[in-house]
Amino acid sequence: MGSSDVSSRECSLVYNEDPDFTDGTTPCDRLGVDLMNVLDDKDEIKQESVPVSDREIEDTESDASAVSSFASANELIAEPHAASETNLGTNGQDGRNVLEQQRDVVARLIEENKETQKEGDKVCIVPKVWYDKFFDPDVTDPEDIGPINTRMICRDFENFVLEDYNRCPYLSIAEPVFNFLSEIYGMTSGSYPVVTNLVINQTTGELETEYNKWFFRLHYLTEKQDGRKRRHGQDDSIMYLSMSALNLVRDLVEKSMNLFFEKADHLDVNAVDFKIWFVSEGSDIATDSNVSTFLNSSYEITPLQFLELPIKKLLIPDMFENRLDKITSNPSDLVIEIKPIEGNHHWPSNYFAYNKLEPASGTTGLVNLGNTCYMNSALQCLVHIPQLRDYFLYDGYEDEINEENPLGYHGYVARAFSDLVQKLFQNRMSIMQRNAAFPPSMFKSTIGHFNSMFSGYMQQDSQEFLAFLLDSLHEDLNRIIKKEYTEKPSLSPGDDVNDWNVVKKLADDTWEMHLKRNCSVITDLFVGMYKSTLYCPECQNVSITFDPYNDVTLPLPVDTVWDKTIKIFPMNSPPLLLEVELSKSSTYMDLKNYVGKMSGLDPNTLFGCEIFSNQIYVNYESTESNAQFLTLQELIKPADDVIFYELPVTNDNEVIVPVLNTRIEKGYKNAMLFGVPFFITLKEDELNNPGAIRMKLQNRFVHLSGGYIPFPEPVGNRTDFADAFPLLVEKYPDVEFEQYKDILQYTSIKVTDKDKSFFSIKILSVEKEQQFASNNRTGPNFWTPISQLNLDKATDIDDKLEDVVKDIYNYSSLVDCAEGVLMQVDDEGDTEGSEAKNFSKPFQSGDDEENKETVTNNENVNNTNDRDEDMELTDDVEEDASTEPELTDKPEALDKIKDSLTSTPFAILSMNDIIVCEWSELGSNEAFSDDKIYNWENPATLPNKELENAKLERSNAKERTITLDDCLQLFSKPEILGLTDSWYCPTCKEHRQATKQIQLWNTPDILLIHLKRFESQRSFSDKIDATVNFPITDLDLSRYVVYKDDPRGLIYDLYAVDNHYGGLGGGHYTAYVKNFADNKWYYFDDSRVTETAPENSIAGSAYLLFYIRRHKDGNGLGSSKLQEIIQKSRHGYDERIKKIYDEQMKLYEFNKTDEEEDVSDDMIECNEDVQAPEYSNRSLEVGHIETQDCNDEDDNDDGERTNSGRRKLRLLKKVYKNNSGLGSSSTSEISEGCPENEVADLNLKNGVTLESPE
């Protein structure tokens, strides 16, 4: 048959028509195991051996036929063309002919195999893409086909785990075909033959490839569990094995026991008996989440879990020769149990024939997984609430899981919490360590998955964790499947807020609206309502609203004030000191308003700055500062020097100009900053008036210096300029001085030399990037220069003045010069006419050089005479004289003056300039001497009676302890809202600093009180460690609850306290909890649990208080719906436990040993009510028998019973020792002593039976 007769498609379909394969399911899928993920977790895939059936299918005739009919690849190719003597190694043969020959051989082998194939024949699985390429007519060169790569279709060769078919399609070919192709093309590195069998489809009766082998999980039934440390380095990972449906039960037993003893290599195979239980997958497993969970996750299972398995078959020797598909139709779980040969022991599967389930003690600790104490302490407080515990312990929550809630977590959080509760409180076997700590790893993993805050191992806040957990449980268990849209009820305009019925109706409507969207066990137990009242200070409008809560955050009435001494620089009085105390949460605006209130100044005229190194360091009005959002404690440090400047501004045309002070100290050439910077305000027309600028500065210095400096008085508003300023009129005869009257009014006619020794004015221009701009506010632009300015760039104010203005501003210098000339003339005895002539033009330059010399000589004489008396003063005068403009009466000079007057005036100050007042050392010392009562270095203290009274009150209250009542009173105390959280009044249509009061309208059954020990304001946090005295019992909330007619009562008892030790940087959480199982108090410190007294919880570490309502009507906690759920689920739980005991007794009758056969019925009856003392747990070995205590008649003198009748199960030993047939008198006896129909009638659970071999 040629290659054209058999297409690729025909060949591929021969072994690919498999219903089990095409339905898309695998044994892993049916067991609910994602084996792909399991395999991904392996360090490496085992590929050491070719995976075939564990036991060769015993079909010797078929194997012999296959072997005898198989020849080498070259022989098979050469047979149809013997004359050509074809050899694949010959390079001369054309590639196309070689490939066609190969295809012919493969097609012939396939056709021959069709005629002889039968069940059990081996087939090999290859990638479909390779197979199609081999038969592709377009491929003519064998080199293009390449080796067979089975790694792409098989993930685990040992366990026969194939890749997803949709991802990597594959098909099967007969083993001879695969051998032929692999001999020619070989296999890629790491690839192995993927061998399986042909099986008969039980439905269609046709042969098909066994793509899906039987898949088993292996479990170990043991009594020694519950989180104990595993000896010999064992882990709890499940073992998997795969078998062909054609394999025998013997093969399954051998492979299972080999894997088991390979894992449990510490056991001596000759020292133990064993049994293997076959657990089929039934519908119960799919519906029983508990069974499904431990089957999917645990290698070791407990006797209790074993009894809950739905279908159990004991594998006995009579089954060993049966094929697997004859005893089950689905892949299953295998459970192995062992029993030591020596000593008196019983099978773990018979555990409950001798032991009762013991109720949990309620004192199980939680292992710290790494900074998880915040979680452990909160969980201990939560799980010890009886109603919440029972709701999850008895699985009452299952019917209320809301997986459709978009705000929830599809029930994962609820299930994780339930699993935790059951691990802590479920009835347990006595063999288990009663108080062994439990690691809440799965719970933490679930919580961390849905909230990244709790995913790592950083310390977190216990209250934040608790709030998230309660909210998650609420949404996962919300009974409202579809939340309808609701609007929050509110009072109508005209409703009387003083009418109790109106207010109560609003509260009832709000609660009803809340329950339309929120109804769960959390709502039943933890949720109450606040009443919030807002009073508008302007229109007296009152707003009342109600809001739900699940915890009450109480402030602590402790000294948490921020205190600081602030300087105030009023405009028209000396500097002041004001001691301030405000709340640590206060803002800069609160401080500003407080300073204005206590000083009597308008807060809108106050500008705050921090001063450092004689200059402005921080401008609190600037948008670049943090004053807009930081608290005072974060904004202003204790060492900061804070000054509030009063700058009254009447209109937008006024400009605020910063002023710095410098002086040249002895031994220095350059001026250095000193004193305190300040500000002056100038009107727009004063910016070019040097006299006005100087007058403003002098007025400020008078107040800043304590009123000492005797600055000369200006002439004021005068019109007789010729009489007041004769020298100016004489120097500028053509100038109309009326236009300079605004400048002339600030000029002094006569000054002394001491005047110029105080300060000179310089102007320093600052770039915009060197400014701190003000915040967006009305009025002038308030700005401050940045620090580290280059003061050497400051220019003298004279350099910015035109000649006439300069002479007006420096008129005192003209007077000084004129007086100096007259004095010199008098000394030389000139004639009267000459004197008059010279005086009339004292600075006439003309052609008379003698006058210049006279003036010069006169100045030198004065300088010489004055130097001894006051050298510093002389230097200043000399410097000023040198800057005087030269007076002239030349026509060109007058023209120049006229031109300057008609030109645009030159601005002295611009918006980016600052004033630098340069003082002489002598002048600064004289003006700001230490003998002043008040000055800028020693401000006057402003009395603060309000602060003094507050300090006195705190001093008297130091000995008084803080109580929970104090906290509750402070909680309901009305407070005035700040500027940053003002309320929008609907009547005023404005944001108002309203008065707000929050009160408890009602309280829930579980009252969670959060003591606000942590104060966090953005970047700053602090902790309050003060002790709050809270009652252990009889907390009466009737004084603090508005709705006092609650029929449930308002008396509460403490049952738990969550503690925090340490500070914000690091700490530790613990819990005091009342255990309702024994009504004792315990201290839970992660895994350590000790008995304690509740009074020990009253300490500065108490953080969260849990109170439970004492119902006066006798009803239970929570809603009637919750009580009904708990009662029903508890009844179901009790029935389940009873069923377990019943099942155990049935199993015991089937499973008991020879020794147990001899135990009297009285001993078994003795165990129905109490654990029989003869089956005590003197060690961790259960089943040690001392019969004399239960039945004295059965005493033996030697105290030990012989083992003459023990029959042992020796299956595995025979395999290990001599590889002979498996058999055991013990298990065989079970089959012999229990007829087949009786075995089938042993109901264990839900009508499922133990089955005997067919």
From Swiss-Prot:
Instruction: Give every DUSP domain span.
Output: 97-199
**Pfam family membership, one:** DUSP
Among its keywords, does the record have Phosphoprotein?
yes
Residue span(s) of domain USP: 364-1110
- Which keywords, in A-to-Z order, does the entry hold? Hydrolase, Phosphoprotein, Protease, Thiol protease, Ubl conjugation pathway
- UniProt lists compositionally biased (Low complexity) regions at 854-864
Q: Which domain of life is it from?
A: Eukaryota
UniProt region (Disordered), positions on chain: 827-893, 1188-1207
Modification Phosphoserine occurs at: 84, 1160
Its BP terms in the Gene Ontology are: DNA damage response; negative regulation of mitochondrial fusion; protein deubiquitination; proteolysis
GO MF term set: cysteine-type deubiquitinase activity
Catalytic activity, as annotated = Thiol-dependent hydrolysis of ester, thioester, amide, peptide and isopeptide bonds formed by the C-terminal Gly of ubiquitin (a 76-residue protein attached to proteins as an intracellular targeting signal)
Q: Where is the composition biased (Acidic residues)?
A: 867-883, 1189-1198
Q: Which residues form the active site?
A: 373, 1068
Q: Which GO terms describe its cellular component?
A: cytoplasm; nuclear replication fork; nucleus
Q: Does the keyword Phosphoprotein apply?
A: yes
What EC number(s) would the UniProt record show?
Answer: 3.4.19.12
Please explain the role this protein plays, according to its UniProt record: Ubiquitin carboxyl-terminal hydrolase that recognizes ubiquitin chains that stabilize FZO1 and promote mitochondrial fusion. UBP12 deubiquitylates FZO1 only after oligomerization.
Please tell me what else the database record remarks about this protein: Present with 7110 molecules/cell in log phase SD medium.
Q: How does it assemble?
A: Interacts with FZO1.
Report the protein name in the record: Ubiquitin carboxyl-terminal hydrolase 12
Q: Which organism is it from?
A: Saccharomyces cerevisiae (strain ATCC 204508 / S288c) (Baker's yeast)
